[in-house]
UniProtKB/Swiss-Prot annotation:
Inducers of expression: Expressed only in the forespore compartment of sporulating cells. Disappears after 45 minutes of spore germination. Expression is sigma G-dependent.
Protein name in the entry: Small, acid-soluble spore protein K
A Pfam family it matches: SspK
Compartment(s) of residence: Spore core
Region (Disordered) location: 1-50
Native source organism of the sequence: Bacillus subtilis (strain 168)
Biased composition, class Basic and acidic residues, residue ranges: 1-33, 40-50
One GO CC annotation: endospore-forming forespore
Family: Belongs to the SspK family.
Listed NCBIfam families: PRK03081.1, SASP_sspK
Cysteine disulfide links: none
Keywords from the named record: Sporulation
GO biological process: asexual sporulation; sporulation resulting in formation of a cellular spore
Domain of life: Bacteria
């Protein structure tokens, strides 16, 4: 059985954490101060249209 941590395993996408995050603050369910974002249905609909 071959494991992913095996020596010499080819990592195809080493840079998967680089670049912009997929989730934007505009579509987050909670704000940075911990309050809940209003109108969740509109927020989720807008997130799907991007």
């Amino acid at each position: 059985m071959v494991r992913n941590k095996e020596k010499g395993f080819p990592y195809e996408n080493e840079n998967k954490f680089q670049g912009e995050p997929r989730a934007k603050d505009d579509y987050a369910s909670k704000r940075a101060d911990g309050s809940i974002n209003q109108h969740p249905q509109e927020r989720m609909r807008a997130s799907g249209k991007r």
